[in-house]
C-alpha cells in the first residue's frame, strides 16, 4: 500500500505549473466518483521513488489531501520527452 501526502494547488495554469516544476514539484488532479475534481501538487522526488516500485501503477494508492484520505488509482502519466521527469499525473477515485 502506497501513501502520499499532497497539497491542494493554490494557483492553476501554465505559469503556475512551471513554477511548481522549478520548485521540484509537479501538478496532478484527482477526479471521478461523486465529488468534484481536485487539483493537487506532489513532490517530484518522492513520487519518482515510489513509481519505480512494483505495483505503483496497479494498486490502489492513498492520497492524504489536507488531512483527508482518498483512495485512488493512477489513470494517466505525462513525462518529459527526454529527461527523467514527471510532468503530470491523473488519479481516478477508486
UniProtKB/Swiss-Prot annotation:
The record's annotation in InterPro entries points to: Rbsml_bL25/Gln-tRNA_synth_N, Ribosomal_bL25/Gln-tRNA_synth, Ribosomal_bL25_short, Ribosomal_L25_dom, Ribosomal_uL5_bac-type
Q: Which UniProt keywords apply?
A: Ribonucleoprotein, Ribosomal protein, RNA-binding, rRNA-binding
What GO terms fall under cellular component here? cytosolic large ribosomal subunit
Q: Name one GO molecular function term.
A: structural constituent of ribosome
Among the GO biological process terms of this entry, one is: translation
Q: By its UniProt entry, which SUPFAM superfamilies does this protein fall under?
A: Ribosomal protein L25-like
Cross-referenced NCBIfam families, in alphabetical order? PRK05943.1
Question: What role is this protein assigned?
Answer: This is one of the proteins that binds to the 5S RNA in the ribosome where it forms part of the central protuberance.
Q: Which family does it belong to?
A: Belongs to the bacterial ribosomal protein bL25 family.
Per UniProt, subunit arrangement is:
Part of the 50S ribosomal subunit; part of the 5S rRNA/L5/L18/L25 subcomplex. Contacts the 5S rRNA. Binds to the 5S rRNA independently of L5 and L18.
**Protein name from the UniProt record:** Large ribosomal subunit protein bL25
Native organism: Erwinia tasmaniensis (strain DSM 17950 / CFBP 7177 / CIP 109463 / NCPPB 4357 / Et1/99)
Taxonomic lineage of the native organism = Bacteria, Pseudomonadati, Pseudomonadota, Gammaproteobacteria, Enterobacterales
Name of the gene encoding the protein in the UniProt record: rplY
Amino acid at each position: 500500500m502506497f501513501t502520499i501526502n499532497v497539497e491542494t494547488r493554490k494557483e492553476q495554469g501554465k505559469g503556475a505549473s512551471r513554477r511548481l516544476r522549478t520548485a521540484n514539484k509537479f501538478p496532478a488532479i484527482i477526479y471521478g466518483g461523486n465529488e468534484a475534481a481536485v487539483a493537487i501538487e506532489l513532490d517530484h522526488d518522492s513520487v519518482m521513488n515510489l513509481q519505480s516500485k512494483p505495483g505503483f501503477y496497479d494498486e490502489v494508492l492513498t492520497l492524504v489531501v489536507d488531512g483527508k484520505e482518498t483512495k485512488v488509482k493512477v489513470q494517466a502519466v505525462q513525462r518529459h520527452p527526454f529527461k527523467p521527469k514527471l510532468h503530470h499525473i491523473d488519479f481516478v477515485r477508486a
